[in-house]
Amino acid sequence: MSVANLKDLLAEGVSGRGVLVRSDLNVPLDEDGTITDAGRIIASAPTLKALLDADAKVVVAAHLGRPKDGPDPTLSLAPVAVALGEQLGRHVQLAGDVVGADALARAEGLTGGDILLLENIRFDKRETSKNDDDRRALAKQLVELVGTGGVFVSDGFGVVHRKQASVYDIATLLPHYAGTLVADEMRVLEQLTSSTQRPYAVVLGGSKVSDKLGVIESLATKADSIVIGGGMCFTFLAAQGFSVGTSLLEDDMIEVCRGLLETYHDVLRLPVDLVVTEKFAADSPPQTVDVGAVPNGLMGLDIGPGSIKRFSTLLSNAGTIFWNGPMGVFEFPAYAAGTRGVAEAIVAATGKGAFSVVGGGDSAAAVRAMNIPEGAFSHISTGGGASLEYLEGKTLPGIEVLSREQPTGGVL
């Protein structure tokens, strides 16, 4: 797929031009509104810095969380503007609205090297509307913010699987380019699918089988092994006839898991032991049991030491590794060993020459929470959902639109 990128745009020249950048700045906040993981802000900075250094007038569109009924003060991008400014080493203006009077006035007042962050793009319901006309109307207002000669740079990989106004529709109206982050993510995913070093090991965790069913079915015919951990492993174990106590369970997926185990028995790898406890709490005492001996009334919150050893041995021989989803409730120290053990095994394999990709989301958060150097992996993705959909073989609207011919005048 041929897509114009940031280097192409910089070669054309952006001095004094308006550039609308769709970034993924959807970072987690604690109860006080403090950012707890700035990974996505850090990852978004290189594209923005390159444009600012080239004297562009930069307008950034981004979202935070999922506002339900318009503007929500708890989901304002105000703390993001401060953190982004620290990363860029310059002041980041924050508009008081998305495409209203304040945003337009601030955008018109920009000079080369200035940056304006629009308020949470999802405060405008048209951003995520299923109605094409609604989304296009918002996209046209975004075009007005960058004016004549304006261009669009797509750099929010975490949202390219969404057909949304600031991701998809805007690229049909403005000359469009892939930012550094999006270009790098696509290069890595293409390497995962087209030039895989064998053996190819996939590690999947997280809560629900239903969330990962598509990628399991797709990768089961491509990977040499798929390790199953996290909350989703209990539905697979139940499909094998084991009692899982009060562990997370998707009853309606048991038959599906049974079918997967029958079809891909030589690929799927499940835990052999678990760390269980009475309640979902950090201070609830842990107990290690075999998968066939989970007591009634107890729930699994992590894979056990035997499983860690088994999975680590498998990963030590891998040539390519894709990891998406923690092995347990890593936020609770007593139940973080599984995730840490798998992460360290992937790091060791990477050190021996394996190509390793951490598929964004909770896996990336776990790596940072455990203070494992990000450079110890070949690549850490910023888009868990987008990565999974790509590996499922789905078309990513925000990428597909970048491959189209550049639009010409008359968009307004």
From Swiss-Prot:
<dbReference type="GO" id="GO:0004618">
    <property type="term" value="F:phosphoglycerate kinase activity"/>
</dbReference>
<feature type="binding site">
    <location>
        <begin position="63"/>
        <end position="66"/>
    </location>
    <ligand>
        <name>substrate</name>
    </ligand>
</feature>
<dbReference type="InterPro" id="IPR001576">
    <property type="entry name" value="Phosphoglycerate_kinase"/>
</dbReference>
<comment type="subunit">
    <text>Monomer.</text>
</comment>
<keyword id="KW-0963">Cytoplasm</keyword>
<feature type="binding site">
    <location>
        <position position="300"/>
    </location>
    <ligand>
        <name>ATP</name>
    </ligand>
</feature>
<dbReference type="GO" id="GO:0005524">
    <property type="term" value="F:ATP binding"/>
</dbReference>
<keyword id="KW-0067">ATP-binding</keyword>
<feature type="binding site">
    <location>
        <begin position="360"/>
        <end position="363"/>
    </location>
    <ligand>
        <name>ATP</name>
    </ligand>
</feature>
<feature type="binding site">
    <location>
        <position position="331"/>
    </location>
    <ligand>
        <name>ATP</name>
    </ligand>
</feature>
<dbReference type="GO" id="GO:0006094">
    <property type="term" value="P:gluconeogenesis"/>
</dbReference>
<dbReference type="Pfam" id="PF00162">
    <property type="entry name" value="PGK"/>
</dbReference>
<comment type="similarity">
    <text>Belongs to the phosphoglycerate kinase family.</text>
</comment>
<protein>
    <recommendedName>
        <fullName>Phosphoglycerate kinase</fullName>
        <ecNumber>2.7.2.3</ecNumber>
    </recommendedName>
</protein>
<keyword id="KW-0547">Nucleotide-binding</keyword>
<keyword id="KW-0808">Transferase</keyword>
<dbReference type="GO" id="GO:0006096">
    <property type="term" value="P:glycolytic process"/>
</dbReference>
<keyword id="KW-0418">Kinase</keyword>
<feature type="binding site">
    <location>
        <position position="122"/>
    </location>
    <ligand>
        <name>substrate</name>
    </ligand>
</feature>
<dbReference type="InterPro" id="IPR015911">
    <property type="entry name" value="Phosphoglycerate_kinase_CS"/>
</dbReference>
<dbReference type="GO" id="GO:0005829">
    <property type="term" value="C:cytosol"/>
</dbReference>
<dbReference type="GO" id="GO:0005886">
    <property type="term" value="C:plasma membrane"/>
</dbReference>
<dbReference type="GO" id="GO:0005576">
    <property type="term" value="C:extracellular region"/>
</dbReference>
<dbReference type="InterPro" id="IPR015824">
    <property type="entry name" value="Phosphoglycerate_kinase_N"/>
</dbReference>
<dbReference type="InterPro" id="IPR036043">
    <property type="entry name" value="Phosphoglycerate_kinase_sf"/>
</dbReference>
<dbReference type="GO" id="GO:0043531">
    <property type="term" value="F:ADP binding"/>
</dbReference>
<feature type="binding site">
    <location>
        <position position="212"/>
    </location>
    <ligand>
        <name>ATP</name>
    </ligand>
</feature>
<feature type="binding site">
    <location>
        <begin position="24"/>
        <end position="26"/>
    </location>
    <ligand>
        <name>substrate</name>
    </ligand>
</feature>
<comment type="pathway">
    <text>Carbohydrate degradation; glycolysis; pyruvate from D-glyceraldehyde 3-phosphate: step 2/5.</text>
</comment>
<keyword id="KW-0324">Glycolysis</keyword>
<feature type="binding site">
    <location>
        <position position="162"/>
    </location>
    <ligand>
        <name>substrate</name>
    </ligand>
</feature>
<feature type="binding site">
    <location>
        <position position="40"/>
    </location>
    <ligand>
        <name>substrate</name>
    </ligand>
</feature>
